[in-house]
């Protein structure tokens, strides 16, 4: 028997469909900020720890380093996750509960305006302007520090660090609180283990005794 008490309920819930536990969560990953402090030093400022500092950093980058430098860059999925974090922080409500969206059209509009504000304040480029052929870590703009930050899974830390030409400035950033209602965040099960119904009882016992 597997002792399910060693797993958090939220992780178990993520592996549960229609009341049935389909897998056992082995690891969880969440979105966090990564910064290239070498570029921030060139701009004469520290990596941001608040929303206000993040907005200020965008304008400072533009004025000091030029139009091609941004404090942040991320793909469409990460932008959506960041918007959810913002909405959770400002409304105190989860994105989805029991497969039902919890936000009104006006609240989602507010979330999109948040992303637009980041673009207008030169915090991050628009998706159209962002030069990405492949993942962000593979682009020259990340590697040479023109894109000085991203919002990515903590499981990908080494991927982003090792891609930098100067990795000495790689920093795992602080949580940025966007509102006082809750600490918004986005996480998912990174690795889960399951055995098929067709597997023999002996094989199942060996499998679970090995990994759990």
Model regions: which residues?
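Short helix-initiation/N-cap motifs at beta->coil->alpha
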Residues: 51-55, 128-143
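Bilobed periplasmic-binding protein-like "clamshell/Venus-flytrap" ligand-binding domains
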Residues: 22-23, 63-76, 122
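Extracytoplasmic/periplasmic substrate-recognition and gating elements
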Residues: 42, 121, 163-212
